[in-house]
Amino acid sequence: MHQGVITFSRNVFLPLTTVCQNHCGYCSFWTPIQKGCIMGREQVIETLRLGAGAGCTEALFTFGERPEMVPGFSEHLAAIGYSSILDYCYDLCKEALRFGILPHTNAGVLSTGEMERLREVNASMGLMLETTADVPAHQGSIGKSPAERLSMIARAGKLRIPFTTGILLGIGETTRDREESLEAIADLQREYGHIQEVIVQNFCPKEGTPMADVTPITTETFCETVRMARAILPEEVAVQVAPNLADAGVLVGCGANDLGGISPVTIDYVNPEHPWPAIDRLTEVAGDAVLRERLCIYPQYITQGWYPPSMEPLIRSLSIKIQERSL
């Protein structure tokens, strides 16, 4: 990423289900199985249509990890004609491409075979590391094993999948834990070269969760961690912060250079109490830096051809579109 440039992606957020095998102490995204626990195809299509009309270039597909492991969920899947949430996601990624929007899927820990299949219809993928530490917030969350998550990130590297990961601050980890987490990500990047951005995200307490009364990190600690990330991560890896969760203008001054996906159409379903800033206000966050729109696949991976050949016309077309919007 060029110095003095702050980037963002224009996206739509599509939470296909909030059912999850994990029960993290800080999460309000999780819900029990109930009617409507799967986002219907019609709603997805309508959201994609609105996103395309608003100039969105990224469809963020996310959902609870391994929801089929939760008793009763498979019946809801069967009712819409599927036996696997990943099969459903695959088909909806194809719909996104049909609307001219590039899919980016974050589905939790996946096997090599599952990633190989999803990469056919995704321009990039992601998985938050969160932390390498064993923290109480992850008790009862089988999918939050740091070793399992690091292993998946490595497998994505072997498959040459442009990848997003990140750390979560304020869930019981120490400063040294943050450093170790960033060092682990940096090591994977040096080995495989596939990590395009690392999210440094602050935990925001949610009412009704076990960690509702936990004090969030201070702006000073957040800024120190962003500086740490910039110092530890290879230069080509963007440091991303969410402008709806913190004072991103301050964090840009500490070394952050990406604002992540911002949607003119959908809310942040993980943090619904924190609305996105309007895209035309992002220049205020960027300050003296140049604000530049990007795709969910970063330019260096486009140059290297790290995408399915079938996506090339769309990637080229969208690259031109965002360049024209920046003029």
Curated annotation (Swiss-Prot):
Reactions catalysed, as given in the entry: 5-amino-5-(4-hydroxybenzyl)-6-(D-ribitylimino)-5,6-dihydrouracil + S-adenosyl-L-methionine = 7,8-didemethyl-8-hydroxy-5-deazariboflavin + 5'-deoxyadenosine + L-methionine + NH4(+) + H(+)
InterPro entries: Aldolase_TIM, CofG_family, Elp3/MiaA/NifB-like_rSAM, F420, rSAM
The EC number(s) this enzyme carries: 4.3.1.32
The protein's required cofactors: [4Fe-4S] cluster
Gene Ontology MF term list: 4 iron, 4 sulfur cluster binding; 7,8-didemethyl-8-hydroxy-5-deazariboflavin synthase activity; iron ion binding; transferase activity, transferring alkyl or aryl (other than methyl) groups
CDD domains, per the entry: Radical_SAM
Cofactor binding note from Swiss-Prot or TrEMBL: Binds 1 [4Fe-4S] cluster. The cluster is coordinated with 3 cysteines and an exchangeable S-adenosyl-L-methionine.
Binding site for [4Fe-4S] cluster: 20, 24, 27
Boundaries of every Radical SAM core domain copy: 6-244
Record keywords, A-Z: 4Fe-4S, Iron, Iron-sulfur, Lyase, Metal-binding, S-adenosyl-L-methionine
Pathway noted in the entry: Cofactor biosynthesis; coenzyme F0 biosynthesis
One family name in Pfam for this protein: Radical_SAM
Keyword Lipoprotein appears in the UniProt entry: no
The protein's role, per its UniProt record: Catalyzes the radical-mediated synthesis of 7,8-didemethyl-8-hydroxy-5-deazariboflavin from 5-amino-5-(4-hydroxybenzyl)-6-(D-ribitylimino)-5,6-dihydrouracil.
PANTHER family referenced in this protein's UniProt entry, alphabetically: 7,8-DIDEMETHYL-8-HYDROXY-5-DEAZARIBOFLAVIN SYNTHASE, FO SYNTHASE (COFH)
Similarity comment: family membership: Belongs to the radical SAM superfamily. CofG family.
Quaternary organization: Consists of two subunits, CofG and CofH.
Name by which UniProt lists this protein: 7,8-didemethyl-8-hydroxy-5-deazariboflavin synthase
